[in-house]
Amino acid sequence: MDQHHGVRGGAPIRRPRRSIETRSHPFRAAGNTQRTYSTPRLSYRDGLSGRASSLEPGGQAHDQNESSTQSTSNNQPSTSFWGYLRRVFSDDAPAQPQAPRSRADFAPPPEEDSSSEEEDEEGPSQAPLDEEDQLMYADQYSVGNSSDDNEEDYLQPEVEYPTSAESGEYHNSGMFAEEEPESESESDMENYETYEENDTEVISDDSHRLTRTWLDRSIRLMDDALAQSSEISKAITKSTRRLYDSQFTPGGRGYKQTETPSQRLVHLSRAGMYDSDEIVMTGDYMEVDDDPNSAYQSWVRAIHHPVAMNPSWEETISNHTNTSFSADIDYDIDELIEMNLARTPPVFEGLLDSADFFYRLPMLYTYATITQDEAYEERQAWSNTQALHGHEQSSWPALVSDYSKGGMYVSPTQEPRGIWRRALKQAMALQLKLCVLGLTEFVTKRELTQHHSAVTFLVDSLLRTAKNCYLASRLLVFAWERRRETGVRRPAEPLIALSGVTLLQPLPPEVSELLEQRTFDIGLRTPQSGVFRAFFGPLVYWAELRRALRDPAAINCRYVGFHLQTSEIYLLARAHSASPGYTKEELVAMEATLTLGTLMLEVALQWIHVASAQLLSENDALKAFRRVSASIPHALAPLGSIRLHDAEFEVLSNPDVMVARDETALSQALFLGYFSVRTALTACMRDYANEVDGGSKETVTGLFLGVGLIIQRLAGHMNFLLNCMAGAALYGGSKIAIHSLTLPRYSLLADVMAPMLQQQSLVDFWRARDDMLEELEITPRPGPPTQGKRVVLEMPLPSDDLPAMTPSGQVNNGAGLGRMVDMAKHLQHYRETIIGDDASSSVGKRGLMKSGVGVRHALEAEKVIRYSPKST
């Protein structure tokens, strides 16, 4: 009978039908049309482990390979009718009974490394200033030609929606945007695959990646191995994933990038400012400024103590043997021309010739060859920096090792300022995987022995960011002017909320002609630029690039990169998907760091805005540039900003923040990271002011690029920190109070910095963490570690760097941070920009209800998402 009817007794043999998209992209989550480096890989817990990747509504596992698997094996009896007949008429011996599996929640992770050997080791009254309460040119400008005649007509929404300053509807307008073209049709995909299979040419971009043909074959082998329950399916799946990632991660042939600004950004740039709008400024800003410090004598009377610098930074500077710029850099201009490096960056192609550009920004020295000895010395300087946890940190690893595989336990320890050593070393490997290895693998595969492409990207993206600052500052001015308008003439609500407190201030048109634009610039869209802006700002880890900027920029970039890496290691060592929450003290410190870090990023971007205009100007000694030319502000206030000075006093003098700073290891790491950035940026800006008047133009250019490298890493760190906090609020149900203007400010700055950094959404971030943990063979586990893995690293005393960093008092009243609001509720207005536009509508309701906000607010948040207006 078997011979006549086949092994299934006549039952039809048919595989479940899958779409062309699913067959071509098995590691892409359903519904995702764009595969980024952080999107999930085919339900990593199920499909990639060989189990069924979906469940029936009743809770039974759906065996999608029943027809093929059971037909080839007699050891797994079928429960179908044909299977019953087959067992009745078959002479085969019945299958041996199998012992029931232990429950997953009580079973230890498979192949968990024992760390019993770890037990043997030891855990090591003032006059108020109005300098920044108003715009830089207060009382010296007026809004001209701002009539609303000739405005474009917008569709009036037919539904009611909130219009409060918190709503931030423009962040959700993507739901009403024009639908993206659907994925390729089946015939188109077949034609594409046929073409690829016949394509045997070498990849022209010298990426040395395997062609798509190998990926197609590997996917088919993986499908066959999973269908037959082959024992080598896990190895085939892992190799297929590696091939897939090489194609569809940033830099891969299949990685697609958006070529034009999103419709949300288009709406944002048009809401509140029109083609006929312009800013007319009056005053003496076009006069030569012989003494920029003369405008800041009132600061000397108001602030009695200079800005405090990190003691560890001062020690680093004092121990450094070469803190000055080396004028005898050896490079051949003819060789650079032959290598096509001495050319104008793409942002100014057609506007400035190469000779004119490099006269204004003399940066050709950054293309000089960095020897292997110099690069090794720079990497060793990073590794030799003393970390809070006492272990060595790497900036350019060849591979990730020296961690325990198996369970990862992130629960709080009994000791104050303590952390599990097992989790810490696992977090060090995970941080390298998330933030560093993507760049190192790209550089290795492309055989980029030099840093030239990174320098070109850095200067190009930095100038594009300055152009976005030009646009954003004007949008905010007109948002303030039209804040009382209604209907389609009303600007976006986040712009209105920020317009009265922003530090992005407009420059006179006469000194910023090269920065003028009317739409947001999203930057270059090449494979290399995709890598350089991904992975939370990875360029600071590249030793050759840091060394190319020369001191004093190089040493400050290294100092910032190291301490922000430490902060992220502690963040990863304290939470994962099985335990996404933090302690109350840790959340207080995280909120304070996020609020101050976002404000500091805004101050730094305004500095980039003014410095870019100054470097590109034919006369860099004008009064319009006094904010970057004067040295007094940077000697008295952090980053030369009274607003940041007052915000630090307001936040850091809070008793809850002071307790959190001293009582938890994570809080100390976060604040040390913040003050490291604040110290390094202040030092670079101060050195820039000292050099710009008659000093070395090469040093000025190096400091400008160094500030850009630091703020890329700072913005990536803020993205990292925000996703950890948002996960604790929405996934962990923690009730977190956050300043109401932090998220609007963060979202606007993320749009401004789009040429430099690719923002990662909450959903993508947590999926990427789980994916990377699986690749590292680490399993998130709730609770404390088991016996033999309970070694604690504890800092005996609070860090000496932190107590003296808080300013002694405020200069003005109020720092423009907003009132305290619930984070879980506030996040619902930022579905596209923060949570992720591919998130389900239920994301966050669990956090709202667990944090005590209630069902009513959860339903209101869902209503706001559903009825976001198209016009904003």
UniProtKB/Swiss-Prot annotation:
Keywords: Glycoprotein, Host cytoplasm, Host nucleus, Late protein, Transcription, Transcription regulation, Virion, Virion tegument
InterPro entries associated with the record: Herpes_UL47
Entry's localization field: Virion tegument; Host nucleus; Host cytoplasm
Short motif Nuclear localization signal, span: 13-33
UniProt PTM comment: Phosphorylated by US3. This phosphorylation is required for proper nuclear localization.
Composition-biased stretches (Acidic residues): 110-134, 177-204
One of the GO biological process terms: regulation of DNA-templated transcription
Positions with biased composition (Low complexity): 66-80, 91-101
UniProt free text on domains: The nuclear export signal is CRM1-dependent.
Description of how the protein assembles with itself and partners: Interacts with US3 kinase. Interacts with UL31 and UL34; these interactions seem important for efficient virion nuclear egress. Interacts with UL41/VHS.
Additional record remark: Expressed in late in the infection.
Protein name according to UniProt: Tegument protein UL47 homolog
Lineage: Viruses, Duplodnaviria, Heunggongvirae, Peploviricota, Herviviricetes
